[in-house]
């Protein structure tokens, strides 16, 4: 929840969910 994964999730979901990232406030975060 704190580390930005450098990916947005405004129109498409996070591809980086495979790396443990999740969508928050239209940006993908890890932890």
Curated annotation (Swiss-Prot):
This is a cyclic peptide. GO terms for biological process: defense response to bacterium. SUPFAM superfamilies: Cyclotides. Pfam families: Cyclotide (PF03784). There is a cross-link at residues 1-31 (Cyclopeptide (Gly-Asn)). The keyword Disulfide bond applies. It comes from the Eukaryota. Disulfide bonds join 5-21, 9-23, 14-28. The keyword Disulfide bond applies. InterPro entries: Cyclotide, Cyclotide_bracelet_CS, Cyclotide_sf. Keywords: Antibiotic, Antimicrobial, Disulfide bond, Knottin, Plant defense. Probably participates in a plant defense mechanism. Has antibiotic activity. Inhibits the cytopathic effects and replication of the human immunodeficiency virus. Active against both Gram-positive and Gram-negative bacteria. Belongs to the cyclotide family. Bracelet subfamily. The presence of a 'disulfide through disulfide knot' structurally defines this protein as a knottin. This is Circulin-B.
């Amino acid at each position: 929840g704190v580390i930005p994964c450098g990916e947005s999730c405004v129109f498409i979901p996070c591809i980086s969910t495979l790396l443990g990232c999740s969508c928050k406030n239209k940006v993908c975060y890890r932890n």
